[in-house]
Amino acid sequence: QQPIPIWIGAAGLPTQRIRRRIGRQADGWFNLCSPEEFPELRDDIYRAADEAGRDPASLGVEAGVAVVGPREAEWKSRVVGWREIGLTHLCLRTLGGGLEKQQHIEKMREAVAELPNV
């Protein structure tokens, strides 16, 4: 793909400076906030994109959802919730579940098969 898409992430909540950079320069961002924090971040980033003459809707946003561990029972509803508030890319995670290599693969296969159609 030309040019290579540029995605930006930050540890935790991105500062205003990083939000502006994402809006001005990035093709998308790796979101690490909660769904409750997301609308404010998205609005700041979209505003920066608009001010830079870019279409905010062209920006991608990714969030990760764990399919194992303490929140395993709610992963499908989390996928639906993220999609409803604007997620464009999804990362299903199996880390932290104490699984062996083959179990990671099997769990991911199951999760993809059960992925909500949103």
Task: State what each model feature region is.
Residues 1-118:
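Active-site-adjacent structural elements that line small-molecule/cofactor binding pockets in enzymes
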